[in-house]
Amino acid sequence: MNKIYYFTGTGNSLQIANDLSEKLGQCTIHKIAEYSGEKIDGRTLGIVFPVYNWGLPLIICDFLRKLDVSDDTYIYAIANYGGLPGKALDQCKDILKENGVKLSADFLINMPGNYIFGYGAKSKKVQEKLFAKEAKKIIYIADFVKIKKQCKIEKSHTIIDRVWCNYFYKHINEFHEADQYYTVDNNCIGCGLCAKRCSVNNITMVNGNPNWNHHCELCASCIQSCPKKAIDYKSETKKEKDI
């Protein structure tokens, strides 16, 4: 049996996991947020995640450190990014190595950016092109994984990417507490959709309003999920996000 573990905020990683699962066949997908350290048995194990601040999301770092997997399982990683890939795959390989786990292959996929805190959505035309490229890359990855082929880490060839990644990633530890800057206006109807869709179960509903519990990943799922656009972050994100 093939297995894929994923972390997703606004859906890019979930799409990749679903698309790859379909191509591989005999594959199950699992949320990384629900992994508690149990041993994973499987023919192959895929780890799918977005790039945050030019590196790994904190939840992925935690997952890799506690990952317990059979010695004969072929392990690969897929990092998707909207801007630049940074050093996410290098980090992934290093953390797994410290944990005594070998990363056999890894891949980069450029997807429509979803970092609503920094920029708006790309045009529909650009998004369609990126999704078309993703579909082709999935076929390539599936063929690669089926024969358990080894490969070197896919890296960015942009100099500015390699320079910026160290500067920006040092701020990743601030993400957990950054949820203190979320606000909710009177348009909130208390539907609880933000809490249900939070990728790390960081939101609880209190008296009909969302309450953030300070282990946020800044994935923007809550903002994207709100049907009334009632959630804002630092008064900067109350706008349509078409992803």
What function would you assign to each model-found segment?
Residues 1, 25, 178-180, 208:
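Generic structural motif recognizing short loop/turn segments at the entrances and edges of beta-strands
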Residues 2-4, 8-35, 39-172, 236-241:
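FMN-binding flavodoxin-like domain, especially the glycine-rich phosphate-binding loop
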Residues 40-42, 173-175, 179, 207, ...:
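Residue-level signal for the start and early helices of compact helical domains
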Residues 159-191, 196-199:
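A mid-sequence, solvent-exposed acidic-amphipathic segment
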Residues 183-184, 189, 193-217, 221-238:
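Iron-sulfur cluster-binding cysteine motifs and their immediate structural context
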